[in-house]
């Protein structure tokens, strides 16, 4: 069954570079689940290095990172060891070895032509609902700043029940929910709002 925004994220139990984990272990936390096409590849290596450099930024937001590809656990270990030896970066988050492709297929992350995982990202909220998803082309690396911005926008919605307008950054005003009655809509106009359907905090 395909994964949809606003629907429950499929649970899984998997072998990783940090031991066996289940998605259900992460209840009450935000989760960033991301897949990469293959170990020992240039773009994926730059992404893992940057995710690790920004690891504390995610932790401060109560976000747990989980990587995934269809490479073997031994391949993951050798690759992460190489990153540590060559770049001095320790990968602190678990990387799933999904060699049977079960999890990748659950999350629609398999390139059936190539047989490997695509470059996908899912943000899963503390209720284990999929709140954000994006796929990048194989030749395009992820924008970690934009992923962090999206996490912060979703968390603003979670805690303050607001929506975030175009190019929203933390500290900017959010958009309040639409009016539920005609009187509420007219009141917004009387308050000087340009439209009844857009009102900021």
Swiss-Prot record:
**Main location (coarse class):** cytoplasm
**Gene Ontology BP term (one):** cell redox homeostasis
* Catalytic reaction equation(s): a hydroperoxide + [thioredoxin]-dithiol = an alcohol + [thioredoxin]-disulfide + H2O
Is Oxidoreductase there in the keyword field? yes
Record-annotated active site: 44 (cysteine sulfenic acid (-soh) intermediate)
User: What Gene Ontology cellular component terms go with this record?
Assistant: cytosol
This chain belongs to which protein, by name? Peroxiredoxin 2
